[in-house]
Amino acid sequence: MTGLPKKLRVPHLAAMKERGERIVMLTAYDATMARLFDRAGIDILLVGDSLGQVILGLDTTIPVTLDAILHHTMAVTRAASRALVVADMPFMTYQIAIEQAMRNAARLFQEGGAAAVKLEGGRAVADTVRALTAAGLPVMGHVGLTPQHVHRLGGMRQQARDDDAADELMLDALAVEDAGAFALVLEAIPDAVAAAVTSRLHIPTIGIGAGLIVTGKCSSVTTCSGCLTRSYRLS
């Protein structure tokens, strides 16, 4: 890439999409990871609630607390000088009320130093996304397989596998974009569905198990190194 900024910010991602440049996002959980990835030129560092499984040995992301994400976000932001740092909002830290979401997101920005937060869900969280962005807090969306809903979904299953489900996912994606999200994670959906969503949206799409026709890709260091694989059930 040419003309790399010293510090990536939300508007730079839109510009990268316009130029047809691929966006690279990796999960990072501590200062060492963040420093290595930052020096390698990774665009976005996601302090994911996946730290529950990767770092803490939990079965799901659901037990991860706001304090845990805050702790790791502080470590990552101390070491990342160029990459955009996005912090996951954990399970039930934004679903009860918009005021709750605002308060919890504010901690990730003020105390953690995050440049953005990520919320799972589509139309159900659109009002929350709108309120956060109106308050000046950048939001990344996340649709498809949403790990915080693993019990309702019946496990880590590929989503949007039939036409009706694909249509519902498209509505969710459009709602999140309309609410002001600056980017959208598409996880565990068929390649064709991800391509269709990417072509409809004006914001960047970041794929996790969603094929190649997306604006960027996300992975974790454990997946890249072969220490841990993330697989999805197809039935």
Short names for language-model regions:
Residues 2-233:
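Alpha/beta enzyme core
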